Curated annotation (Swiss-Prot):
The active site is at E188 (proton donor), S466 (acyl-ester intermediate). This is Penicillin-binding protein 1B. PANTHER family: BINDING PROTEIN TRANSPEPTIDASE, PUTATIVE-RELATED, PENICILLIN-BINDING PROTEIN 1B. SUPFAM superfamilies: beta-lactamase/transpeptidase-like, Lysozyme-like. One of its GO terms (molecular function) is serine-type D-Ala-D-Ala carboxypeptidase activity. It comes from Haemophilus influenzae (strain ATCC 51907 / DSM 11121 / KW20 / Rd). Residues 151-322 are annotated as: Transglycosylase.
Length: 781
């Protein structure tokens, strides 16, 4: 009876237990479904937040200056070829890819690269350049069948800024070669266009391998999963992370089309390391390893990049060339097996070397110029706006050829002088600037041009010595009633007493003196005594006002007599500011390394203002330039005459006390070159401006094509003859420029009175430093 009763009770409980279990299962399933939906929604929000927003903190791309080929420039055949080669175009027998050109009798056919220029994007163009009598005479667009007067060349990427240790060049999918895409899919994910984000067969295969190994050793990831892992997840290998990867891949594939996923992958994938900075995306990797855009590399180079996806470090072509070669050939073999290439082409490509360039440097090649550019950005835009430049294109003013020539000139000359003078601590710096636009073409901060160290061109403040003199003479020549180029200036030793200081006794460098010397000869020979006499006569305040107007407005200039001989410190960058104004005949333009900036959409957000402000009389600047030409012709820089007499260069040497610093500023028909040579510890160089810094300038001239300095005088300046004593002589062969401020006729007259220091009967000039002297009347000479 008891047994029967228990059986009945059990049979009654079974349906109830089943109902309880089913209820629990239903609740659990519903809860799991709700949680999955919510979690899936959360993952979807995470994915959309990134994919629909700013996926990457894109670096600002810095490019070299924009260059054009113009008929108006009257370019020779060889000059055009050199321009193309300098811009990394390739001479070929068949024009097939952007960047190719070939020679045909009296013409050149070139496939010009496409590029988003600051004002507008321009597509690639097939152009024929025709020459007549060895000069460019006609440019034909072979697609539109029209002639053009000029065409622009795409600038070179020279740096990337503000990238959070990740560099990439994100480009649209349509700009990637179809062959790259097909090779990538063949190698990494053959069912990419068929699966829904994950490949179950691949995952199962990887799961079995991992279980057997007892740890995660293999992945079966699709391209979508790889993208999810790189964009959203950590690098740890756990089951939880793998589950998230799979779920997010499903969501990503459901939310976005395959092309969007593929484009993001191509721009995201990690492909190497540039120092501390990661190289992401195939476009940047192509430039990093081959020095060319992804659209211009060969099929075997595509195979190498695709092969590196599996392990950028293991297959690094510089560190592990044999591994890289084997991996590339595996990819080529896959392409052969799937009939993407034929056997003959496979044999050819698999025998090729890797074809990588010398160790890649994307963002560290021109550190001194880039440091100067970053300082420019802070001055022009302010710190708060620099962060908004992410993804922008910065078009710099750097001329790649001039930069290389300047680097080689500094490196070669300083190294030679180190050996010659047995002084291994010598250093050098150089800045080259187009004085008509204020655009800086080259910056060299020291001998180690490839390393971002101390930028002497921008940061080193050193005494300038005689470089100060042209500004003093220009101040005097701005007053033509008192000073002209042939005005005789006293050249006898003087003593000046200043309150609170020992008597100051300036001396000429060569310790030679005379009764007087013409003003222009005093500058040409860089004589100290006449310079001090002129400066004291016009007044230190006026000299300082002139210097600040010409570009030294942020320089601390001491109001003491010694400032007339450059006793204060200035950087080569600031020196260039003043000489830019002088070379531009008194027209001051702000120096810049930035020509323009465009955002990612191509909108112009900055443009350098090339307009000049006249800050000193043009007539005075013209006469000062003429006197500086005399410096080269017969003065302290006369060694230039041997090879460059026909260029009529202007220049100024500078040497400081005990030869601690040597300087030279050279002016040609287009550029100013400011050169400093010295020691970081301020030690003696045993050199002068002529034997030190000038030698760097000479080396630079030997490497480049220089325009003749042909200055057009203002209409108020006329050429008048003088004799050997400086008196007017219209029959003389020697003529000088004279400012006809009152319509004078100088023939037959004597020159201006000889200038001597102020005497007791003279009234000191207003705001002159004679006011602060113990004895306002210097000793009689």
């Amino acid at each position: 009876m008891t047994s029967q009763h228990s059986a009945k009770k059990s049979s009654k409980n079974t349906p109830k237990n089943n109902r309880t279990f089913k209820g629990f299962l239903l609740k659990f399933s519903f809860t799991a479904l709700v949680l999955t939906i919510f979690y899936g929604g959360y993952l979807d929000w995470q994915i959309r937040s990134k994919m629909d927003g700013q996926i990457w903190h894109l670096p600002a791309e810095v490019y070299s200056r924009l260059e054009s080929v113009k008929i108006a420039d009257n370019l020779a055949f060889d000059e055009v070829i050199q321009i193309l080669l300098d811009n990394e175009y390739r001479q070929t027998t068949m024009v097939a890819a952007p960047g190719d050109f070939k020679l045909e009798d009296d013409s050149i056919v070139v496939l010009r690269r496409a590029f988003p220029f600051p004002d507008k994007a321009e597509p690639q163009r097939v152009l024929r350049l025709r020459f007549s009598h060895n000069k460019l005479s006609r440019i034909e667009d072979l697609v539109t069948v029209k002639t053009v007067d000029e065409f622009r060349l795409a600038p070179k990427l020279i740096a990337m800024l503000q990238s959070d240790n990740e560099d990439r060049l994100a480009i649209p999918l349509q700009n990637y070669p179809r062959l790259l895409i097909d090779t990538l899919i063949l190698t990494e994910d053959r069912r990419f266009y068929e699966h829904n984000g994950i490949n179950p067969v691949g995952i199962l295969r990887a799961l079995i391998a991992n279980i057997r190994a007892g740890q995660t050793v293999q992945g079966g990831s699709t391209l979508t999963q790889q993208l999810v892992k790189n964009l959203f997840l950590s690098r740890e290998r756990t089951i939880t992370r793998k589950a998230n990867e799979a779920l997010m891949s499903l969501v990503l594939d459901w939310r976005y089309d395959k092309n969007r996923i593929l484009e993001t992958y191509l721009n995201e994938i990690y492909l190497g390391q540039n120092g501390d900075t990661q190289i992401h995306g195939f476009e940047l990797a192509s430039q990093f390893y081959f020095g060319r855009s992804i659209r211009e590399i060969s099929l075997d180079q595509i195979a190498l990049l695709v092969g590196m996806v599996k392990g950028p470090s293991l297959y690094n072509p510089w560190r592990n060339p044999q591994n890289a070669l084997e991996r590339r050939n595996i990819v080529l073999r896959l392409m052969l097996e799937h009939k993407m290439i034929g056997d003959e082409l496979y044999q050819l490509l698999s025998q090729r070397p890797l074809g990588v360039q010398k160790k890649g440097q994307i963002s560290r090649k021109y550190p001194a110029f880039i440091q100067t550019l970053q300082a420019d950005l802070r001055r022009k835009l302010g710190e708060h706006k620099i962060s908004s430049l992410l993804g922008a294109r910065i078009f710099s003013t750097m001329d790649l050829k001039q930069q290389a020539q300047a680097e080689n000139a500094v490196g070669n000359t300083v190294s030679q002088l180190q050996l010659k003078m047995k002084n291994p601590h010598l250093e050098g710096a150089m800045i080259i600037t187009d004085y008509r636009t204020g655009e800086i073409r080259a910056v060299v901060g020291g001998l180690q041009t490839q390393y971002a160290g101390f930028n002497r061109a921008l940061m080193a403040k050193r005494q300038i010595g005689s470089l100060v003199k042209p500004s003093i003479y220009l101040t005097a020549l701005s007053n033509p009633e008192q000073f002209r180029l042939n005005t005789p200036i006293n050249n006898q030793p003087i003593t000046i007493n200043v309150k609170g200081s020992p008597p100051w006794q300036p001396r000429n460098y060569d310790k030679k003196y005379s009764d007087s010397v013409m003003l222009m000869d005093a500058l040409a020979r860089s004589l100290n005594i006449p310079t001090v006499n002129i400066g004291m006569k016009v007044g230190l305040s006026k000299v300082i006002d002139t210097q600040k107007a010409m570009g030294w407005d942020n320089v601390e200039i001491p109001k003491v007599p010694a400032m007339l001989l450059g006793s204060y410190t200035i950087s080569p960058y600031d020196v260039t500011k003043l000489y830019q104004t002088l070379a531009n005949q008194g027209g001051r333009i702000a120096l810049t390394t930035v020509d323009s900036i465009a955002d990612r959409q191509g909108n112009l957000i900055f443009q350098h203002d090339k307009s000049a402000k006249q800050v000193v009389p043009q007539e005075a600047a013209f006469q000062t330039l003429f006197a500086m030409q005399q410096t080269v012709e017969r003065g302290t820089a006369r060694s230039l005459q041997k090879d460059y007499a026909d260029l009529h260069l202007a220049g100024k040497t500078g040497t400081t006390n005990e030869s601690r610093d040597t300087w030279f500023v050279g002016i040609d028909g287009k550029n100013i070159s400011t050169v400093w040579l010295g020691r970081d510890d301020n030690g003696e160089t045993k050199l002068t401006g002529a034997s030190g810094a000038l030698q760097i300038y000479k080396d630079y001239l030997n490497r480049t094509n220089i325009e003749k300095l042909a200055i057009t005088p203002p209409t108020t300046v006329k050429w008048v003859g003088i004799n050997q004593y400086g008196d007017w002589d219209c029959e003389s062969y020697r003529t000088i420029p004279i400012w006809l401020n009152n319509g004078q006729n100088f023939c037959g007259e004597t020159s201006s009175p000889s200038l001597t220091p102020t005497t007791e009967t003279e009234t000191p000039p207003q705001e002159s430093l004679w006011d602060v002297l113990d004895n306002p009347n210097p000793p009689a000479q």
